[in-house]
């Protein structure tokens, strides 16, 4: 069955007096019934996310197969444990995102209580990507690591649920001419054609005046990554 609607997951954020001044504390989704029209004409149904015990559903990757819609995310604030939730497509595309199934202890199950806290898939970040690479026959996860002048790393898995490899750091950005830089939100864009996988990341500054004045930052930076398959592994 073909589904013509579009589902977008949204973060709920509020101001705080520490750190970078805000944090995520919940999630919403919006169901757009006519996504092929101009955005100003979209018919949108906002769906308030249910209790997910600090897990921000859909803050990162969203995928689907023939039966289910899957959403990754991370526990906020700060701890970033990663889980995977799913809904039947028929339910998701009619706006029913209640009662998702969680991948917990090797099986799909509903989660009704905060404790016991399930084992996460891995420790991730608020924003990252997951996609399937048909040439490698692997799921690939890309994220930024570290808060500040960090690195970009990759994990791989045979399935959406894992087991995921340990992260491999493959790129360290440079920040010429940027005062007090920090890097975040690395993710892959497999939909872009090229001899490899295009990856974007963002650069910002802890110095607000630098953010306001430096027109080279706060725009996505692109790199091209090529993965060479090792037949012995």
Task: Give the residues covered by each predicted segment.
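Beta-propeller and closely related beta-sheet repeat lectin domains
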Residues: 1, 57-61, 126-129, 182-187
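Charged/polar, solvent-exposed surface patches and flexible loops
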Residues: 190
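Beta-rich carbohydrate-recognition and catalytic domains
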Residues: 2-6, 10-53, 65-68, 73-123, ...
């Amino acid at each position: 069955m073909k589904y013509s609607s579009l589902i977008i997951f949204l973060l709920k954020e509020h101001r705080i007096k520490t750190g970078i001044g805000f944090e995520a504390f919940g999630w919403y989704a919006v169901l757009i019934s006519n996504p092929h029209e101009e955005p100003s004409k979209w018919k949108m149904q906002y769906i308030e996310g249910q209790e997910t015990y600090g897990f921000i559903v859909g803050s990162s990757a969203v995928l689907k197969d023939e039966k289910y819609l899957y959403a990754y995310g991370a526990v906020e604030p700060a701890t970033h444990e990663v889980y995977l939730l799913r809904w039947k497509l028929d339910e998701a595309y009619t706006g029913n995102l209640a009662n998702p199934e969680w991948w917990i202890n090797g099986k799909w199950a509903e989660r009704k209580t905060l404790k016991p806290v399930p084992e996460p898939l891995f420790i991730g970040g608020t924003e990252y990507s997951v996609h399937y690479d048909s040439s490698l026959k692997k799921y690939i996860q890309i994220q930024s690591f570290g808060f500040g002048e960090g690195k970009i790393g990759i994990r791989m898995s045979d399935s959406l649920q894992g087991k995921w490899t340990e992260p491999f750091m493959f790129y360290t950005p440079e920040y010429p001419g940027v005062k007090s830089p920090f890097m975040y939100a690395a993710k892959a864009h497999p939909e872009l054609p090229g001899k490899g996988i295009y990856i974007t990341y963002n650069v910002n500054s802890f110095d607000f005046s630098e953010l306001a004045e430096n027109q080279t930052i706060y725009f996505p930076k692109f790199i091209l990554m090529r993965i060479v398959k090792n037949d012995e592994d």
